[in-house]
């Protein structure tokens, strides 16, 4: 049975900067480098998913850019075991939430033409008065994929990267699972930071990279218990 690591991530303020909804190529390379190291330490493949209430055509554009970043990273890896799989799946707001008015037909056709097949609708709660519909949808996606993966693979670790209120339920779910970790950048709500010790001192993608690096340090410590730890090390245990 294939050994895998499930990695779920939000977008705004995590993968993408809050200021301009972009990421630097160098920052992404460093993030992917830490994921590659995680694969090596766990002897398992990372399967990454993106969850965000953005529109599905926006998600398609982002996945296209991420695919290019993964391709560029993999080209530089001589060892096949260090290469990463492309994003496995994503959830974004359903098309009908963004299709209305006289532009309906044009917009719908644009969705049909552009939408990446990996994207599914972010499920909405049955209660229209739910104050956190994105949080409901994210949790539904995370639970569904995790359950399916546990039937098909040997899931060695589950990681959730997020920073906001609509990430909290998914964070709690991942924390409740064996091998579950939550990673937050510094620009996270205090409610999110309270759910983990893996909080980066930097913002956005750099903060996530630091959090994944800290998981790698924990794994390295387990593999080499005699290795000295930094004096300011404040990490949760594996």
Region locations from a protein language model:
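C-terminal cap/substrate-recognition subdomain and adjoining C-terminal extension
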Residues: 2, 6, 64-238
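Active-site environment of divalent metal-dependent phosphoester hydrolases
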Residues: 57-58, 163
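Short amphipathic alpha-helical segments and helix-helix/interface helices
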Residues: 29-42, 60-63, 142, 171-172, ...
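Active-site neighborhood of HAD-like aspartate-dependent phosphohydrolases
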Residues: 1-53, 57
């Amino acid at each position: 049975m294939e050994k895998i690591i499930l990695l779920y991530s939000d977008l705004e303020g995590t993968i993408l900067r809050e200021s301009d909804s972009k990421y630097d190529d160098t920052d992404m390379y460093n993030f992917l480098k830490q994921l590659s190291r995680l694969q090596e330490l766990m002897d398992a493949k990372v399967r990454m998913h993106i969850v965000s209430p953005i529109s599905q055509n926006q998600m398609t554009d982002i996945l296209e850019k991420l695919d290019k970043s993964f391709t560029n990273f993999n080209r530089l890896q001589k060892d096949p075991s260090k290469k990463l799989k492309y994003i496995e799946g994503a959830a974004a707001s359903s098309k009908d939430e963004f299709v209305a008015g006289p532009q309906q037909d044009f917009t719908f056709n644009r969705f049909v033409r552009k939408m990446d097949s990996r994207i599914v609708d972010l499920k909405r709660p049955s209660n229209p008065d739910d104050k956190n519909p994105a949080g409901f949808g994210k949790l539904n996606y995370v639970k569904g994929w995790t359950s399916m993966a546990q039937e098909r693979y040997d899931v060695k670790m589950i990681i959730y990267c997020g920073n906001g209120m609509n990430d909290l339920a998914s964070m709690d779910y991942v924390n409740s699972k064996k091998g579950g970790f939550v990673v937050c950048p510094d620009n996270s709500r205090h409610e999110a930071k309270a759910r983990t010790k893996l909080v980066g001192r930097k913002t956005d993608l750099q903060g996530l990279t630091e959090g994944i690096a800290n998981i790698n340090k924990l794994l390295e410590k387990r593999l080499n218990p005699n290795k000295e730890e930094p004096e300011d090390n404040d990490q949760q245990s594996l």
